[in-house]
Amino acid sequence: MSKFYEWISPDSDVLELEKTGLKPPPMYKVVLNNDDYTPMEFVVEVLDKFFSMDLEKATQLMLTVHYEGKAVCGVFTAEVAETKVAQVNIYSRDNEHPLLCTMEQA
């Protein structure tokens, strides 16, 4: 087996694996903001449709939005967060509701 490695001389340049040091992507919170006009049922519908929440979790989060003014719907990479914010805002406008979804750095 030593014959297999004979072609590598001890003083030759040998490539070593370099650690790339990949960092995880920055994460963003998708936030639903309260308003005085959007029906609670519509907020629950949005949470179900765009964040795949079951009825109980969506209702709890809707109540948090209602009583605390805003709530985090989820934490995502920038591209996913931007997409969800746009989807919710477009869907809200299409249904003539002023519901506002925003994103904040986590």
Swiss-Prot record:
UniProt record, GO biological process: protein catabolic process; proteolysis
Source organism, top-level taxon: Bacteria
Similarity-based family: Belongs to the ClpS family.
Function: Involved in the modulation of the specificity of the ClpAP-mediated ATP-dependent protein degradation.
Database matches in PANTHER family: ATP-DEPENDENT CLP PROTEASE ADAPTER PROTEIN CLPS, ATP-DEPENDENT CLP PROTEASE ADAPTER PROTEIN CLPS1, CHLOROPLASTIC
Quaternary state and interactors: Binds to the N-terminal domain of the chaperone ClpA.
Protein name: ATP-dependent Clp protease adapter protein ClpS
Species of the source: Aliivibrio salmonicida (strain LFI1238)
Source species taxonomy: Bacteria, Pseudomonadati, Pseudomonadota, Gammaproteobacteria, Vibrionales
